[in-house]
Every structure is written in C-alpha cells, then in structure tokens.
Regions:
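Activation segment signature within eukaryotic-like protein kinase domains
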Residues: 119-120
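Conserved short submotifs of the Hanks-type protein kinase catalytic core
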Residues: 82-96, 100
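Protein kinase catalytic-loop region centered on the HRD/HxD motif
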Residues: 125-135
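Conserved N-lobe ATP-binding subsite of Hanks-type protein kinase domains
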Residues: 25
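Activation-segment/catalytic-loop signature of the eukaryotic protein kinase fold
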Residues: 78
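C-terminal lobe helix-coil module of Hanks-type protein kinase domains
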Residues: 180-285
C-alpha cells in the first residue's frame, strides 16, 4: 500500500485501508477540517502511462461527481497530492451487499421474499436515476452495492461505467466486453458496449440470486459460465424455491431474456411491475425458449470471444484475452 494510517492527502488523514484493487487503493479517511469520515480512492499513478486507464479514471471521476441520488454512492471532492490524483467518496457505514446476503441466508435459510422485492425496488430506483442521466453501470453485482445497517442500498464502483455519448475506449487487443462473468449480459460477453438493457440483465441476475440463493448460470470455470449466458435459459424461480410468487419469477426472467430486445426496455417498467406484483399476469409474459446467441450452440462452430473480465471482488479491472472453443463447453 502506498499510504499508511496517519498519512495525509491534503486535509484528509488516512485512518485505515479498505481495499486494494488492480487499479486503485481505497482508504477510510477523515477530513481534518470538518471531522467528516470519507472514502479515498487513490489510483496507482504508474498505471496512467496507459492512456486507456487514465481515461477510465477521468470518466469515473466525471460520473461520480455528476451523481446525486440516495441510492448511489456520492463523490464529495477530488484532488492531487504530490502528483497523485485521488477521489473523495461518501463513506457508507455498513458493508457490501454480498456480506448481507450471506448473513440473511445463515439466519433464515434463504433471503426473505419481502427483502428480495425491497432490494429489487431500491436497485431499480438507482438504475432509473443513472439511466436518466445517461450512465450505464455495466458491472452491477452484490460486491458493487453498499448496504447500511438500516437496510438502504447504494450502488458504487463506476470503474467500467459508460457515459452516454462518451468516446469508445480502445484497449490493446481487447474489445469493450466488460463486466463480471456471473452477471454479464450476453451482448457484453460478445464484446459489445452494452446499454441500459445490459444493466437490466444484471439486475435480473441479482434478483434471481437473491430469490434462489444462487446465480442462474455457474459453470466449472468462468468460460463455461459465460457460455451459459449465451446458450441456456434460467430455470424458473418457482422451481428453485416454491414460495417465490409466479409474478416475481416472470419479472425477473423477463429482465434476463437473452436478447436485449426481449427484455424490459426501461428499468422503470421493471420497477413498476415489481411494485405492483398483484397486478402482474405471468401468462402475458413471453418467456419461451430463445435461440442461442449468434448460433453458438452448433457443435462444429468455434467463435473467438475477446473479453475484459473483472472477476475479483474489489478489483476494478482484470484484463484477459481469451479464445473460447464453445463447442467444448456445450
């Protein structure tokens, strides 16, 4: 770590180390002038020799400073100390959503359905705000959601987010397939940038995991997991857990349709259905089988997928170039 407890970044005193990723270190700090506790995100300046990483940092800073919503972690300040840039974020007293999921599962055997619905509504509200402001998160997962002791959720970590109209970043030998395999939309796996519907897909995967206790597609390795998103349909939640309402199952699986045009076009529509489950008629939802994405199920067909994968909790990015022989995985 570049900083120790007691170090100062301008008026901010480092209190503790919160984490270290592939791209930045995160610290708990205190504003010596106001006494306010904050989070300092300090990117490794050596990485800025790569123009792509520098642009990604600038983009995250721009995104974070533009946000003002109770369901999204806020940026408070930013600066540069001895040629090292840093971002000051709202300190959220609590933990990440993954830890809360484990705790509730240990207590109740499964996350209560009313909690599943509440979390879904909170996350949908945050995404609705982000999308209305031209921001696509592109890496929504429990590790990137903060949870307070009072049950409030805040979406965080915009290292892979996309601003509407932002210039496409090009990574050497890589496409824009960015995300985490368990939650990546099929179009992201295929190297597309993704749009609001990619976030809706990830929201659906999270909702499925909340209700079922497991993600819908989990292979022996992350290549097999991604192949599942491209070729398989999730088992109905009502088969995984008998107390899941059929209406909730329909909403979640519509959000997770393989092809973007088959999903909700707006997260606001998914939120509305979630808030009015008693009015949702599952028989009106088209949840039938979908063809594999791009015909990838053909046993003799091999396709090259070059992806950018962030698969370690707390890491901003992990760059991986791969060639997947899908016929071996299916």
């Amino acid at each position: 770590m570049r900083h120790a407890n007691g170090d100062r970044l301008d008026q901010f005193e480092i209190l503790d180390v919160l984490g270290q990723g592939a791209y930045a270190e995160t610290y708990l700090a205190r504003n010596a002038e106001t006494g306010q506790q904050v989070v300092i995100k300090s990117p490794d300046p050596n990485l800025f020799a790569d123009p792509g990483i520098f642009q990604r940092y600038k983009r995250e800073t721009e995104i974070a400073r533009s946000i003002n919503h109770p369901g999204v972690q806020r940026a408070l300040d930013g600066g540069e100390h001895r040629s090292e840039p840093y971002l000051v974020l709202e300190y959220v007293e609590g933990t990440n959503l993954r830890a809360v999921m484990r705790e509730l599962t240990a207590q109740h055997g499964a996350i209560p359905i009313d909690v599943v619905i509440d979390w879904g509504e909170q996350l949908a509200s945050a995404l609705e705000y982000l999308h209305a402001h031209g921001i696509v998160h592109r890496d929504l997962k429990p590790e990137n959601v903060l949870a307070t002791a009072g049950g409030a959720l805040k979406v965080a970590d915009f290292g892979t987010a996309l601003l509407d109209g932002a210039k496409r970043l090009t990574w050497k030998h890589l496409t824009d397939g960015i995300g985490t395999p368990d939650y990546m939309s099929p179009e992201q796996i295929q190297g597309e940038r993704g749009d609001e519907r990619s976030d809706i897909y990830a929201w659906g995967v999270m909702m499925y995991e909340f209700a079922a206790g497991a993600v819908p597609f989990r292979g022996d390795n992350w290549m097999a997991t991604m192949a599942g998103h491209l070729t398989k349909s999730p088992p109905p939640l009502t088969q995984r857990r008998h107390e899941v309402p059929a209406a909730l199952d329909a909403v979640v699986r519509k959000a997770m349709r393989r092809y973007p045009d088959h999903r909700y076009s707006k997260i606001a529509d998914a939120r509305h259905d979630l808030e009015h489950l008693d009015e949702v008629d599952p028989s009106t939802f088209d949840l039938g089988p979908e063809p594999p994405m791009g015909g990838l199920a053909a046993a003799s067909e091999r396709r090259r997928l070059i992806v950018l994968v962030g698969g370690v909790a707390g890491a901003f990015i992990a760059l991986v170039a791969i060639i997947i022989a899908l016929s071996v995985l299916l």
